Structure formats: structure tokens, C-alpha cells
């Protein structure tokens, strides 16, 4: 029973003393440089040993297949050792080169036969014969071997065989369509391709032509609709003035420039325009014509204070309309939303020069200022209101039509697709007749 107790105090101090005498080894390999120095250092390509023998071969000697030829059978061999073994078969003296420890083998280096090549310099010579052969073939030789899959050519057979094994198994395709078999080449090309794409993305792209034309067309149509709504309000104002006592109005039909147009034509004109290009362009022409007429009406209101003064009797109005239809020029107009076609009656406007018309306008202006009882000439734009065959009174704007030239009124040799102002130059000048109730009325035949 005392043995464990005696053994324990004896064994524990001895274990402690043993651990104290053991010193750790910080460097398990105390002499690593000695083993590395014993290894042979490989020279870098193009950095030969200064003590090496430099050999310069001609292109023919370098690229020849069999440099060593047997003098008996003219068989060629790549190495001299192979030739010596072949000579033994002919019972010729042969000798293999044997190396001894006493002999110092001098290292050989080869330069490229191409004078413009960087490896033609002895300081950049290549260290082995096989390496200089492949270099000359790759850089300066003919590419004889072609891949059947990708049609890529190689000058060295070993390169062609290595490529044939991996061709088509793994490829890297760029977004531009270029194929790469090597990942590093693909990454380099992809970086350049992405930079080119970012540079091209900075340029501002041209908007599509159809969308641009549609937007511009919509702006013009909306602007025309605003002008048309303004004219519609003025037309309503004129109609309200016609509702005064002494005027009997009926808005079922409106005679415009000698043409009887239903009132729904003007109502439909204020509706939203269609999206088609042809309807929109037609609407623009129609609105432009109406805007020019409205401008002429406003200008005439500023210069004439006696417009819409007297009513016209039934006989006078019927007689006036007959003269207008027989002498005036009638133009056709097509409603945009209603496909109603109106007949076009040809007419001729008296051929007068612009100077003559202006002189005539000055003369007529002096007559109006001198005589308070004289009435203005009939203005081209007439707004007559009819109800079947009943006589109606109308307010008409009277101004000398000879005071405006044909070009100014927009009445030319060509016909328009919208109603134009009609000017009658052939009506004789006469004094206004008196009505049955004694009130002077405007004679439309003036």
C-alpha cells in the first residue's frame, strides 16, 4: 500500500526535472540555404549564361528534319547518338559520347536566324535547340497545320495537336460574337469590349421619327382646337345679337359662302380630332382657314362702326343671294368628322391688279366719309339664316371688297379644302332702297 505513495513523490520530481531540461527548437531546419544552393538554377528565357557557347544556325540547318545523315544509306537522324547506334548496324565504327566527372560540359545557346528578331542578339539567345526551332516556326515560319473545327492555323505541330484536343470542348463567347478558347484572352477582350460599350452609350440616341411627328401633330391640333373654340364663342355672340327685336332667326341651317351647311358641322368641329395623320392635317388646314377669316372679321370690326345696322327684307335677301351664287366663287369644304362632300361651283374673280384695288379702296373710303347715308360695300363673308322658304332678317358685315387684294384674302388660283372669303367685284354700285316701313336697308347688290 506504501508503494504508490513512495513512487508518486519520486516520479513527479523526476518528470518535472526532465521537462525543464528539454529546450524547444525554434528552427526545425537550421540550414535551409545549403539545400537550396545545391539545386540548379534555371535561367530565364532570353537570359543565357555568359559563359555559354553561342551557336548561330542558318534557317535551313535549323529547320531541317534530319541533321545527321548516314553515309551508307543516307538515312537522317535528329540526334548524333541515334546516328552512332545506326552505324553499329552497318558494322561501322561507332562511338557514343560519354561524360566523365573530369570533363567540363560547356553549355550551348542558340540565336534566331532572323536579324530583325530580338532573339538574334546573343544576350537574348535561347537555351535549347528545340526552343529555337519552335520560336522560329511560330514567329517567322509558315503555318502549315489548320484546325478542322475553327479553321485556326498553327506553325508548330505540337501546338496544333494540343489545340485539337480542347477545341470545341470549352469556349468563351463575348457579347460581340467573338469566341475564345482561353479564359485569360476572353477576360482581356471583355474588358475592352465593355469599355467600348460604355463609351458608345454616352452618345444621345435620336428619338423615333413617328413618335416625334405624332407629338408635334398633337400640339398643332390642340392649338387649332383652342382657336376653333374661340371662334365658336364669337359665332354664338353674333347669334345672340341676331336675337334682338326686329330680327327673326332660325339656326337650323346656316348659309356660308353660298353653301347651306347644317349647324352640326360646326358642332362636330369642336370634338376631339382623330389620331390619324390625314385627318389631323386636314383639320389643321381647316382651322387655319377659320383663323384667317376670324382675323379679317376682327380687323373689319375695328375699322367699320356701321356693320350689322339694318335688316334686309325678304325680296332683297333672295335677290342678293342669287347674285352672290351667280357671280361669286364657291369653294368646297369637307367636314372632318362628317363625311359630307359639298359641290364645288367654279367661278372667276375679276382680274384686277393689287395697285388698282388699293386705289379703288381709297376712293370708296372717301365716298363713305363724305356721305353719311352711303352704306359700306358687301363683305365677302356672309352668314345668312334660312328656315325653309320664310324670309329672315340678317346682320351682315358691309365693307368694300375692293379694298382687299385677292392674295391678302387668301383667294388665289388654287382651290383650298376649307371655306374661303368670297369677294364679288362685279356688283354695281347703287343707292340702298327703302323698305316698306320706311327704314333704309343695306343693298347686297352694291
Curated annotation (Swiss-Prot):
Record's keyword terms, sorted: Activator, DNA-binding, Metal-binding, Nucleus, Phosphoprotein, Repeat, Transcription, Transcription regulation, Zinc, Zinc-finger
Species of the source: Arabidopsis thaliana
Annotated function: Transcription factor that, together with JKD, regulates tissue boundaries and asymmetric cell division in roots by a rapid up-regulation of 'SCARECROW' (SCR), thus controlling the nuclear localization of 'SHORT-ROOT' (SHR) and restricting its action. Confines CYCD6 expression to the cortex-endodermis initial/daughter (CEI/CEID) tissues. Binds DNA via its zinc fingers. Recognizes and binds to SCL3 promoter sequence 5'-AGACAA-3' to promote its expression when in complex with RGA.
Keyword presence, tRNA processing: no
Region (SHR-binding), start-end ranges: 182-194
Name of the encoding gene: BIB
Placement of sequence motif Nuclear localization signal: 132-139
Name of the protein this chain belongs to: Zinc finger protein BALDIBIS
Zinc finger (CCHC-type) stretch: 172-195
Record GO biological process: positive regulation of DNA-templated transcription; protein localization to nucleus; regulation of DNA-templated transcription; regulation of meristem growth
Superkingdom assignment: Eukaryota
Region of interest: Disordered: 20-53, 425-446
Biased amino acid composition, Polar residues: 427-446
Zinc finger boundaries on the chain: C2H2-type: 68-90, 110-140, 145-168
Tissues and organs where the protein is expressed, per its UniProt entry: Expressed in roots, especially in vascular initials, cortex, endodermis, and quiescent center (QC).
Alphabetized PANTHER family for the sequence: SERINE/THREONINE-PROTEIN KINASE RIO, ZINC FINGER PROTEIN BALDIBIS
Modified residues annotated as Phosphoserine in this record: 58
UniProt xrefs under Gene3D superfamilies: Classic Zinc Finger
The protein's assembly and partners: Binds to RGA and SCL3 competitively in the nucleus.
Amino acid at each position: 500500500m506504501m508503494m504508490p505513495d513512495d513512487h508518486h513523490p519520486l516520479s513527479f520530481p523526476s518528470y518535472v526535472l526532465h521537462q525543464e531540461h528539454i529546450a524547444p527548437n525554434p528552427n526545425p531546419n537550421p540550414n535551409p540555404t545549403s539545400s537550396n544552393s545545391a539545386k540548379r538554377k534555371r535561367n530565364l528565357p532570353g537570359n543565357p549564361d555568359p559563359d555559354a557557347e553561342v551557336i548561330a544556325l542558318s534557317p535551313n540547318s535549323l529547320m531541317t528534319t534530319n541533321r545527321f545523315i548516314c553515309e551508307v544509306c543516307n538515312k537522317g537522324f535528329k540526334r548524333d547518338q541515334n546516328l552512332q547506334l545506326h552505324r553499329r548496324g552497318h558494322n561501322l565504327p561507332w562511338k557514343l559520347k560519354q561524360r566523365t566527372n573530369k570533363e567540363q560540359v560547356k553549355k550551348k545557346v542558340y540565336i534566331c536566324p532572323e536579324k530583325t528578331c530580338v532573339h538574334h542578339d546573343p544576350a537574348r539567345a535561347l537555351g535549347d535547340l528545340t526552343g529555337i526551332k519552335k520560336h522560329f516556326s511560330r514567329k517567322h515560319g509558315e503555318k502549315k497545320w489548320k484546325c478542322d473545327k475553327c479553321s485556326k492555323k498553327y506553325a508548330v505541330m505540337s501546338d496544333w495537336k494540343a489545340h485539337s484536343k480542347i477545341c470545341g470542348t470549352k469556349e468563351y463567347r463575348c457579347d460581340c460574337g467573338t469566341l475564345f478558347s482561353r479564359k485569360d484572352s476572353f477576360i482581356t477582350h471583355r474588358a475592352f469590349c465593355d469599355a467600348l460599350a460604355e463609351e458608345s452609350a454616352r452618345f444621345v440616341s435620336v428619338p423615333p421619327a413617328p413618335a416625334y411627328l405624332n407629338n408635334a401633330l398633337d400640339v398643332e391640333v390642340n392649338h387649332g382646337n383652342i382657336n376653333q373654340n374661340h371662334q365658336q364663342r364669337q359665332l354664338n355672340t353674333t347669334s345672340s345679337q341676331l336675337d334682338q327685336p326686329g330680327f327673326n332667326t332660325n339656326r337650323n341651317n346656316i348659309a356660308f359662302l353660298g353653301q347651306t351647311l347644317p349647324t352640326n358641322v360646326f358642332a362636330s368641329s369642336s370634338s376631339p380630332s382623330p389620331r390619324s395623320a390625314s385627318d389631323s392635317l386636314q383639320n389643321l388646314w381647316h382651322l387655319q382657314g377659320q383663323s384667317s377669316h376670324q382675323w379679317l372679321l376682327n380687323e373689319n370690326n375695328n375699322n367699320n362702326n356701321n356693320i350689322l345696322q339694318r335688316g334686309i327684307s325678304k325680296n332683297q335677301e333672295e335677290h342678293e343671294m342669287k347674285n352672290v351664287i351667280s357671280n361669286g366663287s364657291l369653294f368646297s369644304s369637307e367636314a372632318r368628322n362628317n363625311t359630307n362632300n359639298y359641290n364645288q361651283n367654279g367661278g372667276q374673280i375679276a382680274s384686277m391688279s393689287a395697285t388698282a384695288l388699293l386705289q379703288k379702296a381709297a376712293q370708296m373710303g372717301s365716298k363713305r366719309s363724305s356721305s353719311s347715308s352711303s352704306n359700306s360695300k358687301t363683305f365677302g363673308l356672309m352668314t345668312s339664316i334660312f328656315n325653309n322658304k320664310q324670309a329672315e332678317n340678317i346682320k351682315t358685315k358691309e365693307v368694300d371688297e375692293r379694298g382687299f387684294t385677292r392674295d391678302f384674302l387668301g383667294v388665289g388660283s388654287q382651290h383650298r379644302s376649307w371655306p374661303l372669303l368670297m369677294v364679288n367685284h362685279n356688283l354695281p354700285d347703287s343707292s340702298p332702297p327703302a323698305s316698306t316701313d320706311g327704314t333704309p336697308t343695306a343693298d347686297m347688290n352694291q
